[in-house]
């Protein structure tokens, strides 16, 4: 993400639990130890952490309040990383300009979710696996497991393991 942003002459800033010096030097990124300090400076906030107890509702009311009113948030992580109510409020009241999400909590969103009423929110289906490397791995796993099945071996990711009884 940082490399692509750099190609558009974006200033790259980031927050993480740990500093990544090698990646910083590759794209000229600036590390912010405090999330809210980074949010106050960022024009675009792209979320990509795993969902853990620590990152649950990482973006909630306080974090949206810290963002610029012209800020754009993109959640490409997991749905629960963003508090839906706080996101709705931030977009509805103009605390942030726009948002785009390809993950929701719950997945899928109920059809009556107020998020669907917002014109400044783009909701897309999750496409996290749609990268060449991941698709190659998926293809390799499928072929490997097909061959295992043809050889009569137990398939490790079998969705109906009762066939082995």
List PLM regions with ranges.
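The conserved SAM/SAH-binding core of class I Rossmann-like methyltransferase domains
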Residues: 15
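C-terminal helix-to-coil terminal segments
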Residues: 107-165
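Short, structured coil segments at secondary-structure junctions
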Residues: 8, 27-28, 117-119
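Conserved anion/nucleotide-ligand pocket segment
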Residues: 1-11
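Rossmann-like adenosine-cofactor binding region
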Residues: 18-114
């Amino acid at each position: 993400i940082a490399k692509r942003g750099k190609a558009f002459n974006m200033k790259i800033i980031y927050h993480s639990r740990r500093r990544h010096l090698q990646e910083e030097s590759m794209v000229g990124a600036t590390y912010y130890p405090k999330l809210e300090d980074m949010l106050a400076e960022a024009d675009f906030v792209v979320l990509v952490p795993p969902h853990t107890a620590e990152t649950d509702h990482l973006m909630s009311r306080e974090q949206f309040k810290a963002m610029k009113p012209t800020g754009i948030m993109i959640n490409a992580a997991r749905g629960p990383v963003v508090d839906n109510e706080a996101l709705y409020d931030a977009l509805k009241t103009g605390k942030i300009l726009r948002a785009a999400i390809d993950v929701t909590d719950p997945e899928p969103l109920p059809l009556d979710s107020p998020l669907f009423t917002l014109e400044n929110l783009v909701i897309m289906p999750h496409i996290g696996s749609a990268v060449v490397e991941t698709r190659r791995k998926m293809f390799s796993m499928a072929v490997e497991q097909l061959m295992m099945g043809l050889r009569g071996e137990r398939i490790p990711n079998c969705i109906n393991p009762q066939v082995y009884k």
